[in-house]
Amino acid sequence: MVTLKPTKRDFIFDRFFEKKNNYEYFYYEEDPTVENDIELFGYSKFTCDASYEDGEVQWNYIIKDHRILGITAVKNDGDNLKIKFLEINSKLRGRGFGAETIEYFKALKDNKKYKAILLYPKDEEVAEHFYKPLGFKENGGELIY
């Protein structure tokens, strides 16, 4: 099962978005046993800043067996848990780590008694092939579980 380790948004931005090509590998500094194995493609600092102006967002590393698999950002929005960002290392996709992360959030929803998990997928293909098979339903422009 994956776990989440909180981190600071600025640390992620410094590591990913300020690099010229965004191909930087690094280790989880608070736990030196975590390997250098995460990368993030296709996002600019501007895009992420614009996406998260609506309040406090908790950034987390997605970790399994001391390996950073990806990053996620979530927001406690009263009765709902909003997944603002979920990205698995492109070299590790298709192995179920994203689905494990969603299962983690489903368990969190049940334990915290959130009414729903909300998210806004990058595109319709991601919604159809990833989130909907995991139980998410369309609700206007968002997906809800």
Put a short name on every predicted segment.
Residues 118-132, 137, 144-145:
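Conserved beta-strand-loop-alpha-helix junction that forms the acyl-donor binding cleft
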Residues 88, 94-107, 133:
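Conserved acetyl-CoA-binding loop-helix of GNAT-fold acetyltransferases
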Residues 7-84, 89:
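Acetyl-CoA-dependent GNAT
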Residues 1-12, 137, 142-145:
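Acyl-donor-binding surface of acyltransferase catalytic domains
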Residues 112-116:
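A general structural motif
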